[in-house]
Regions:
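Forkhead-associated
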Residues: 29-108
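A short, polar/charged loop/turn motif at coil->beta-strand junctions and beta-hairpin connectors
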Residues: 18-20, 27, 34
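Short polybasic amphipathic segments
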Residues: 20-24, 77-79
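Low-complexity, Pro/Ser/Thr/Gly/Ala-rich intrinsically disordered linkers and tails that serve as
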Residues: 1-22, 111
Length: 111
């Protein structure tokens, strides 16, 4: 009674039709990311507005994909991702992004 490995579907195979969902959490508020790119900043033009004097008008951009990345858009104070001061980083589920004095949590999930 040994299982036949050839007949088992690999556990890592994504379910058909499952899409990865992306969102960020700022101060407990969830912001769905529905486009390929999301600009965070203090400006009303930003996709997600962060009302923080340490945040530039167009501070940084999150680009979803495999992998998702974040890019500093020439902000005054830069970005810190998972404790590293950087201009560009790869994001994973649970990444902590600090812009100004605001912490943004990046989240992604299948389906």
């Amino acid at each position: 009674g040994y299982p036949q490995p050839a007949t088992q579907r690999p556990a890592a195979a994504p379910m058909s039709g499952a899409r990865t969902r992306y969102w960020i959490e700022i101060n407990g508020t969830r912001h769905q990311i529905s486009r390929a790119t999301l600009v965070l900043g203090r400006s009303t033009d930003a996709d997600v507005r962060i009302d923080d004097p340490g945040v530039s008008r167009r501070h940084c951009e999150i680009r979803t994909g495999t992998p998702s990345t974040i890019q500093d858009l020439g902000s005054t104070n830069g970005i810190v991702v998972d404790g590293q001061h950087t201009t560009r980083a790869t994001l994973r589920d649970g990444s902590r992004i600090v812009v100004g004095s605001t912490t943004v949590i990046y989240r992604q999930a299948e389906g």
